[in-house]
Amino acid sequence: MKVVEVKHPLVRHKIGLMREADISTKRFRELAAEVGSLLTYEATADLETETVTIEGWNGPVQVEQIKGKKVTVVPILRAGLGMMDGVLEHIPSARISVVGIYRDEETLEPVPYFEKLCSQVDERIALVVDPMLATGGSMISTIDLLKQRGCKQIKALVLVAAPEGLAALEKAHPDIELYTASIDRCLNENGYILPGLGDAGDKIFGTK
């Protein structure tokens, strides 16, 4: 599995701001989208382009445009919605596919409860977004579903990843790519990432 920890100064600065204990919902939400945007920039660097001729201001001109496969953004509910706008900033025509999964707080296992994938999802590059890769269960379950539906090119974008989650994801799906702003130290006994960001879903939506 290709793992890219994006170490751009802006990414490191913004993810550092997100770790503040008393950060406001508004600020956390803004930063989640901003870091999601920067991760998207890195994750799409290998998209193929083709030369096409368009009508410019002074006659025909050759330009490069994205060729071939289109993109679907796959936010894992609910926290993944906080990164979606950052992805769409760069790919506004992307289709949106939604997967609902929550983590059982006792077993730490993923529990699927909703899915709505876009048409022709099997012909698209899937960008799966979720702020936290802790145990990896939700991401693995989502990618399982996408592969069952025929997706062949899948990239995961997460704000923060734990080594345990990375190991589990690599074992389950060694053929995908993952982009993260930070690989953190470890999981605690409750399955939360240390130092982490806290509960990203609660911070994005202002709930507890």
Swiss-Prot record:
Cofactor (UniProt): Mg(2+)
Alphabetical UniProt keywords: Allosteric enzyme, Glycosyltransferase, GTP-binding, Magnesium, Nucleotide-binding, Transferase
Cofactor binding annotation: Binds 1 Mg(2+) ion per subunit. The magnesium is bound as Mg-PRPP.
Pathway field: Pyrimidine metabolism; UMP biosynthesis via salvage pathway; UMP from uracil: step 1/1
EC number(s) per entry: 2.4.2.9
SUPFAM superfamilies xref list: PRTase-like
Record field: catalytic activity: UMP + diphosphate = 5-phospho-alpha-D-ribose 1-diphosphate + uracil
Regulation: Allosterically activated by GTP.
InterPro entries: PRibTrfase_dom (IPR000836), PRTase-like (IPR029057), Upp_B (IPR034332), UPRTase/APRTase (IPR050054), Ura_phspho_trans (IPR005765)
Protein origin, superkingdom: Bacteria
Residues that bind 5-phospho-alpha-D-ribose 1-diphosphate: 78, 103, 130-138, 199
GO BP terms, alphabetized: UMP salvage; uracil salvage
Residues where uracil binds: 193, 198-200
Enzyme class: transferase
Entry's Gene Ontology molecular function annotations: GTP binding; magnesium ion binding; uracil phosphoribosyltransferase activity
Matches recorded under PANTHER family: ADENINE PHOSPHORIBOSYLTRANSFERASE, URACIL PHOSPHORIBOSYLTRANSFERASE, CHLOROPLASTIC
Purpose of the protein: Catalyzes the conversion of uracil and 5-phospho-alpha-D-ribose 1-diphosphate (PRPP) to UMP and diphosphate.
Similarity comment: family membership: Belongs to the UPRTase family.
UniProt name for this protein: Uracil phosphoribosyltransferase
Organism: Shewanella amazonensis (strain ATCC BAA-1098 / SB2B)
Gene responsible for this protein: upp
